[in-house]
């Protein structure tokens, strides 16, 4: 019998290899045996394996209601808005054993605002066995607990400050402090203060740290001319480590010369700062005292260092000004910046109808004054200043014959009402008045000074550019009678004072009624 020769069996090209199929040991579903993990299907793995085991599902967040910050243990307080990235990061950092898995997604789940609960839904991923990745989502509930931070606790407790800046100016008014207050508010220089206390000759600013007080002192040097003295007081000492605790005091004294003051410079100093005539006006206060000679329009700058080498008092301040009426005015053609030099004849307002005394002088207000206008100025004729510096100027051969009878300072608007309604407002610092409240006379004087400052803001465009003015959206009370409303309207129409355009004003977000519609 013939036998066939053996033939080799080769697999056919293009035939795919099939894997072994097994049944899930738990539910009996057919699965691929070559890629299965422990003979379990994916659904059984999800039901029997918990990759979030060991991760806490509840937590506590501490919130300070005063400064609206959250506690990041052990002692750091961070600012975070509701449902913000910062708050979500803080929530994830508070969970234990979260670092051993991979975070795929995390988001907030809406809760009632008054429930004091924050829910976060977290999606994680981890390797189970034999390269099988499993993804799982779960929710974590945080309870919001109220706790006062250290800074807020210090602000409500006396004598917890570490540094104080005492700002003083030895004058009879606080006009410079009103300007300084607005500059502080505009630049937010008071944000680190724990208390602001008003004193007789100035204001005290209290800080929790020394570097905050030093930063505030640097700000003062950039806006007003000051001289600085510092001291420290030992409050405690550790005998074992040698550590010492100090309280620091910075005394900043502002030059006692204010805007619109009449200044009599010592003759030597007048030559030193630009050979300006010694009798001049202070037209602006900045990092230095800026002086103007109204007879020639010459200007000079008196720095703080130069002043304190030879300090002197102003010859007269704004409380000594009297009202004059312009009888005649003629411009000379000399101009410097906004000022126009003019020759003017004025009469004292109190002398009208009593005598015929008139005074001839030069003024820098040629761009503002017209015959019949009212102007405020200083009366030099017949005035005893009791000043050795002024006596030296009178006896000087060079300047004795140039002393005018009258020095005009600024235009006056007699028809302007005192407490008229303005379309703008200024913010004020939250100051502690101390143990003793101001007397009625002192309060009236402070109101007069503030009203004068508001008028200066209305009249001086350069001054307004350095301040932050806000729209006055406060609703006024409805008059009880129509006659009262008519009288108020007529008075405002007759008001000849300068007004501020709405384009120069900012919106005050504290007065806006913002509602979140959800």
UniProtKB/Swiss-Prot annotation:
InterPro entries: Nmd3 (IPR039768), Nmd3_N (IPR007064), NMD3_OB (IPR048898), NMD_SH3 (IPR048899). A motif (Nuclear localization signal) lies at residues 410-427. A motif (Nuclear export signal) lies at residues 502-511. The keyword Cytoplasm applies. The keyword Coiled coil applies. It is found in: Cytoplasm; Nucleus, Nucleoplasm. GO terms for molecular function: ribosomal large subunit binding. Residues 473-518 are annotated as: Disordered. Residues 504-518 have a biased composition (Acidic residues). Acts as an adapter for the XPO1/CRM1-mediated export of the 60S ribosomal subunit. Associates with the 60S ribosomal subunit. This is 60S ribosomal export protein NMD3. It comes from Chaetomium thermophilum (strain DSM 1495 / CBS 144.50 / IMI 039719) (Thermochaetoides thermophila).
């Amino acid at each position: 019998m013939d036998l066939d020769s053996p033939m080799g069996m080769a697999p056919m090209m293009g035939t795919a290899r099939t894997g072994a199929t097994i049944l899930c040991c738990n539910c009996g579903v057919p699965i691929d045996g070559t890629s299965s993990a422990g003979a379990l299907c994916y659904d059984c793995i999800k039901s029997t394996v918990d990759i979030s085991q060991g991760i806490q599902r509840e937590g506590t967040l501490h919130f300070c209601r005063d400064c609206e910050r959250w506690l990041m243990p052990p002692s750091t307080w961070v600012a975070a808005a509701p449902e913000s990235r910062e708050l979500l990061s803080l929530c994830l950092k508070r969970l234990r054993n979260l670092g051993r898995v991979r975070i795929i997604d995390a988001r907030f789940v809406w809760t009632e605002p008054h429930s004091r609960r924050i829910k976060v839904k977290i999606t994680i991923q981890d390797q189970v066995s034999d390269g099988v990745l499993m993804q799982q989502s779960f929710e974590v509930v945080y309870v919001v607990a109220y706790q006062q931070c250290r800074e807020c606790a210090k602000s409500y407790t006396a004598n917890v400050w570490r540094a104080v800046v005492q700002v003083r100016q030895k004058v009879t008014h606080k006009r410079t402090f009103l300007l300084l207050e607005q500059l502080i508010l505009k630049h937010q220089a008071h944000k680190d203060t724990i208390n602001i206390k008003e004193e007789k000759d100035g204001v005290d600013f209290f800080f929790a740290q020394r570097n905050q007080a030093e930063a505030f002192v640097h700000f003062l040097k950039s806006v007003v001319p000051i001289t600085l003295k510092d001291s420290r007081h030992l409050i405690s000492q550790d005998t074992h480590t040698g550590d010492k605790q100090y309280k620091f005091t910075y005394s900043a004294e502002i030059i006692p010369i204010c805007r619109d003051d009449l200044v009599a410079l010592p003759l030597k100093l007048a030559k030193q700062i630009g050979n300006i005539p010694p009798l001049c006006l202070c037209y602006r206060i900045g990092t230095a005292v800026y002086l103007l000679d109204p007879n020639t329009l010459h200007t000079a700058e008196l720095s703080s260092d130069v002043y304190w080498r030879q300090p002197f008092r102003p010859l007269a301040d704004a409380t000594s000004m009297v009202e004059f009426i312009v009888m005649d005015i003629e411009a000379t053609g000399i101009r410097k910046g906004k000022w126009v030099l003019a020759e003017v004849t004025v009469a004292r307002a109190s002398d009208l109808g009593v005598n015929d005394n008139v005074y001839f002088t030069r003024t820098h207000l040629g761009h503002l004054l017209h015959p019949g206008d009212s102007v405020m100025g200083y009366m030099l004729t017949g005035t005893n200043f009791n000043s050795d510096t002024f006596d030296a100027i009178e006896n000087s051969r060079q300047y004795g014959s140039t002393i005018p009878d009258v020095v005009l300072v600024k235009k006056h608007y007699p028809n302007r009402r005192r407490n008229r309604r303005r379309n703008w407002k200024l913010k004020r610092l939250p100051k502690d008045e101390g143990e003793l409240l101001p007397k009625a006379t002192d309060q009236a004087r402070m109101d007069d000074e503030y009203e004068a400052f508001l008028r200066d803001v209305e009249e001086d465009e350069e001054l307004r550019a350095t301040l932050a003015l806000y729209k006055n959206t406060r609703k006024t009370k409805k008059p009880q009678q129509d006659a009262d409303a008519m009288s108020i309207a007529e008075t405002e129409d007759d008001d000849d004072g300068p007004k501020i355009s709405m384009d120069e004003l900012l919106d005050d977000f504290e007065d806006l009624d913002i509602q979140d519609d959800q």
